[in-house]
């Protein structure tokens, strides 16, 4: 009957009832409330909690961590461990409700502990992070107590906020909860991992094979050459290093170690390649790998491991320290002290080891005992050591009375509280001698403290272009054009030397005209004596030159025979008027007009301006410098640094195909005559990225005298020079660009002298179309250019043997282009050299990818 009545009641109310811990009732009566339900009502009461029970624990079922190997512990890494904090409960007596059953404590008497899942191990821990974890004040349903088997546990815990007296007594006991990762939203991982330092801990690699074997293929022994990973210390043989390390985007690291911090014991070897890598990689690849190993972020020294004046550095402070004009040498993790005023730098408890750049805003304030001094004499608030005191005495500094000195970065010192300096420590040579005796630092040289234009890690690579060629082969013209094109002007001293060379050449050209004039006079006198009548030009009377000009003309011819025309430019102020008067003589003008077509082009250029150039105030223009001969003999070696300006055509390309406008190039002009015996000095240019060899297209029609006094064709002599360059050991495996110069002169020369004049080109027999207007009928000069380039390519292929790399062989290529006197052609040739360098890098990378892919495919099959 009671059950029927209860079903008819629409809104029953809950009847709270005290929880009886010793009762054995069913689940409904064991809860904190006795609740009656209606069919249409929704339960809105408090949460339901199970009665906590102390169940027997199976020890074998307890999850335990694997034992930690001491070899896997990395130096400089500390792991966050938070102690277990018990709940404060001032209302509960010590023995209230605590019972032991079967040796285990009832969970009702324990504290609530929240275990938070983590999967990141940081190199630093925070003591405050354990206080940020909150335990829910309300106990959720039993479904929330289920722990996922894959949920990771953490050792972080915090104290639960205690409840008020009534709630503690009414709600019941607290329970142990395991919070899954999605429930730990209030856990702030930033307290454990600082920005940029979430580097996972790594273990040292374990060798599976015998001692000394490769970690990948388990072959080899202790004497086998191997490459070592700078993170896990794994060692790989020559055949496995590329498979294990891949493209090495962060240097010599295993592919699994990319992104991890390096072993600090290997920091000194960063950027120092091994002999294996030199054989394994090309020069450009090796530079890229070593540069990435030094500059990548993962390999940088952690700032928190550098402690200066009892304060760990931040990333900005470490950047300031490493990029200052004179940074500390071989910086390693440790405690240092730094005198910001004088620049003294040293380890805590030791004397100064270096003088770095002063006034760097890094670290804390220096203390008195940082260098462990015991002299009671202070410099900038630091008690100095005995070796420093001895150095001060040698420098003549009065140290009686335990003074306190204030020393500036330049070495000037004064007593504290005084305005005027007493003297300068480094002005005395005895001070530097004392520093050498007692191993104390001295100020850096002036060149060492000059500020860098850009930080070291931001400096671009410098591509070196070696420019070489035969005498008058056009290499000097290309060098001068490059300076003019890329706005690298000559210095005042160089312009004075160029002016001297141009004026000396001018007297050489004038002597050529005077010699022709004397020869024409003799011919005219012979014709007159034989009764023949000459033309109007030759009928000029021989006494048309007055005695003063005749004497000057004979003087010029005599000095030309003696090879001493260099005496005229210094006296240009006195001789300028005489040269002008001599040049205005009608007989000399008639001789010049008759001789003009046979003179060299640059001689005609300067003789047309003889009145201007012969003056003492003459200043050579860019075109004068370009037309001048003999500048290659001005110095055996000259170089110019430049960068290519961006063109509108390049700017229209996508960013992936654009060149870096900040990339620097160095054009080195080398005269072969300055290389010494057996070209020993050529070893200085082993780091050249590209060799530009210049050949004049008109050399086939000229003859020169070789070292033995024999007359040989100049093109054959250039061919021999090219062979010697290509086969020289210092230029092995270098890319060559053949630049055929003087193409504009070839168009004139080939009409007068056929190309088959040179015996090397005797098989030149181009097909000539009958239709001269056809676009498929190129000019003879263009045909000759392609033929000469083809001959040099055949010669290049016959000299060099195939190069073997990673099991494949390939033939090096000879690149060819043409230039003339126009500046555009020189600019195109140098930009072509830039493209060759880029192609070489991309081609090598693609070749490596293909090689690695084929090897991996064969190994997997």
From Swiss-Prot:
Residues 131-143, 157-168 have a biased composition (Basic and acidic residues). Residues 464-477 are annotated as: G1 motif. Residues 818-823 are annotated as: G5 motif. It is found in: Nucleus. GO terms for biological process: defense response to bacterium; G protein-coupled receptor signaling pathway; response to bacterium. Ubiquitous. Strongly expressed in vascular tissues, root and shoot meristems and lateral root primordia. Disruption phenotype: No visible phenotype. Enhanced susceptibility to P.syringae. Its cofactor is Ca(2+). A zinc finger (RING-type) spans 214-257. Keywords: Calcium, GTP-binding, Metal-binding, Nucleotide-binding, Nucleus, Plant defense, Transducer, Zinc, Zinc-finger. It comes from the Eukaryota. Disulfide bonds: none annotated. Ca(2+) binds at residues 476, 632. Residues 665-674 are annotated as: G3 motif. Coiled coil: none annotated. A motif (Nuclear localization signal) lies at residues 204-211. Residues 146-156 have a biased composition (Low complexity). Changing residue 476 to A: Strongly reduces GTP-binding and GTPase activity. InterPro entries: Gprotein_alpha_su, GproteinA_insert, P-loop_NTPase, XLG_GTP-binding. Interacts with GB1. Component of a G-protein complex at least composed of XLG2 and GB1. Interacts with RTV1. The helical domain (492-627) is required for self-activation. Guanine nucleotide-binding proteins (G proteins) are involved as modulators or transducers in various transmembrane signaling systems. Binds GTP with specificity. Plays a role in the root morphogenesis by regulation of the cell proliferation. Acts as a positive regulator in resistance to pathogen that triggers the salicylic acid (SA) pathway. Promotes the DNA binding activity of RTV1 specifically to promoter regions of FT and SOC1 in vivo leading to the activation of floral integrator genes. Belongs to the G-alpha family. XLG subfamily. Dark-grown xlg1-1 xlg2-1 xlg3-1 triple mutant plants showed markedly increased primary root length compared with wild-type plants. Dark-grown roots of the xlg triple mutants also showed altered sensitivity to sugars, abscisic acid (ABA) hyposensitivity and ethylene hypersensitivity, whereas seed germination in xlg triple mutants was hypersensitive to osmotic stress and ABA. This is Extra-large guanine nucleotide-binding protein 2. The gene is XLG2.
């Amino acid at each position: 009957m009671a059950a029927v009545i209860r079903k008819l009641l629409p809104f029953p109310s809950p009847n709270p009832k005290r929880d009886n811990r010793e009762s054995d009732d069913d689940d409904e009566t064991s809860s904190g409330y006795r609740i009656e339900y209606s069919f249409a009502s929704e339960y809105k009461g408090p949460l339901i909690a199970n009665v906590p029970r102390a169940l027997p624990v199976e020890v074998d079922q307890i999850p335990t961590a694997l034992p930690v190997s001491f070899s896997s512990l990395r130096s400089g890494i500390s792991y966050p461990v938070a102690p277990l904090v018990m709940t404060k409960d001032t209302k509960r007596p010590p023995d209230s409700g605590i019972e032991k059953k079967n040796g285990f404590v009832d969970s009702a008497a324990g504290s609530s502990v929240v275990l938070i899942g983590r999967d990141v191990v940081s190199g630093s821990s925070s003591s405050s992070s354990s206080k940020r974890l909150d335990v829910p004040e309300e106990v959720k349903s039993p479904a929330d107590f289920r722990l996922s088997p894959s949920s990771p546990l953490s050792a972080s815990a915090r104290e639960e906020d205690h409840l008020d007296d009534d709630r503690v007594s009414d709600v019941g006991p607290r329970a142990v909860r395991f919070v899954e990762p999605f429930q730990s939203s209030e856990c702030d991982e930033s307290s454990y991992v600082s920005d940029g330092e979430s580097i996972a801990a790594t273990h040292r690699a374990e060798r599976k094979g015998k001692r000394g074997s490769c970690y990948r293929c388990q072959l080899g022994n202790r004497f086998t050459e191997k490459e070592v990973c700078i993170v896990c210390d794994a060692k790989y043989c020559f055949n496995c290093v590329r498979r294990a390390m891949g493209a090495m985007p962060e240097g010599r690291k295993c592919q699994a170690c990319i992104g991890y911090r390096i072993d600090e014991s290997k920091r000194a070897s960063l950027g120092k390649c091994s002999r294996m890598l030199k054989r394994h990689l090309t020069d450009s690849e090796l530079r890229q790998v070593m540069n990435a190993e030094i500059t990548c972020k993962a390999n940088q020294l952690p700032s928190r491991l550098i402690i200066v004046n009892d304060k760990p550095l931040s990333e900005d402070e470490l950047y300031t320290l490493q990029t200052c004009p004179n940074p500390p040498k071989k910086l390693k993790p440790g405690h240092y002290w730094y005198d910001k005023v004088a620049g003294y730098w040293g380890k805590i408890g030791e004397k100064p080891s270096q003088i770095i750049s002063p006034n760097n805003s890094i670290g804390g304030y220096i203390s008195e005992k940082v260098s462990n001094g015991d002299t009671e004499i202070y410099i900038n608030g630091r008690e100095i050591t005995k070796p420093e005191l001895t150095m001060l005495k040698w420098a003549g500094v009065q140290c009686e009375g335990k003074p306190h000195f204030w020393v500036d970065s330049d070495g000037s010192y004064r007593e504290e509280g005084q305005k005027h300096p007493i003297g300068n420590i480094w002005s005395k040579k005895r001070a530097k001698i004392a520093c050498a005796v007692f191993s104390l630092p001295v100020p850096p040289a002036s060149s060492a403290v000059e500020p860098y234009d850009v930080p070291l890690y931001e400096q671009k690579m410098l591509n070196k272009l070696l420019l070489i060629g035969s005498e008058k082969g056009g290499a000097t013209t290309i060098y001068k054009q490059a300076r003019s094109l890329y706005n690298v002007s000559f210095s005042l001293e160089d312009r004075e030397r160029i002016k001297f060379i141009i004026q000396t050449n001018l007297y050489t050209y004038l002597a050529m005209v005077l010699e022709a004039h004397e020869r024409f006079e003799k011919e005219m006198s012979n014709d007159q004596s034989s009764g023949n009548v000459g033309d109007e030009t030759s009928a000029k009377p021989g006494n048309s030159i007055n005695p003063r000009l005749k004497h000057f003309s004979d003087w010029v011819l005599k000095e030309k025979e003696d090879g001493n025309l260099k005496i005229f430019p210094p006296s240009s102020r006195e001789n300028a008027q005489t040269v002008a008067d001599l040049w205005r003589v009608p007989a000399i003008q008639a001789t010049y007009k008759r001789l003009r077509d046979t003179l060299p082009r640059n001689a005609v250029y300067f003789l047309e301006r003889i009145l201007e150039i012969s003056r003492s105030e003459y200043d050579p223009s860019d075109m004068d410098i370009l037309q001048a001969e003999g500048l290659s003999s001005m110095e055996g070696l000259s170089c110019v640094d430049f960068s290519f300006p961006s063109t509108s055509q390049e700017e229209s390309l996508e960013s992936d195909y654009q060149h870096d406008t900040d990339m620097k190039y160095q054009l080195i002009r080398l005269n072969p005559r300055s290389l010494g015996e057996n070209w020993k000095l050529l070893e200085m240019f082993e780091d050249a990225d590209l060799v530009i060899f210049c050949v004049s297209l008109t050399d086939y029609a000229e003859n020169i005298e070789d070292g033995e006094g024999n007359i040989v064709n100049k093109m054959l002599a250039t061919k021999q020079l090219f062979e010697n360059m290509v086969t020289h050991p210092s230029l092995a495996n270098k890319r060559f660009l053949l630049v055929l110069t003087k193409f504009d002169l070839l168009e004139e020369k080939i009409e007068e002298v056929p190309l088959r004049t040179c015996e090397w080109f005797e098989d030149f027999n181009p097909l000539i179309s009958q239709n001269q207007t056809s676009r498929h009928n190129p000019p003879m000069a263009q045909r000759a250019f392609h033929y000469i380039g083809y001959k040099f390519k055949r010669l290049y292929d016959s000299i060099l043997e195939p190069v073997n790399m990673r099991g494949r062989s390939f033939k090096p290529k000879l690149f060819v282009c043409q230039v003339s006197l126009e500046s555009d052609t020189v600019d195109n040739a140098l930009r072509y050299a830039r493209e060759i360098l880029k192609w070489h890098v991309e081609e090598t990378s693609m070749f490596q990818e293909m090689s690695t892919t084929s090897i991996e495919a064969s190994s997997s099959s």
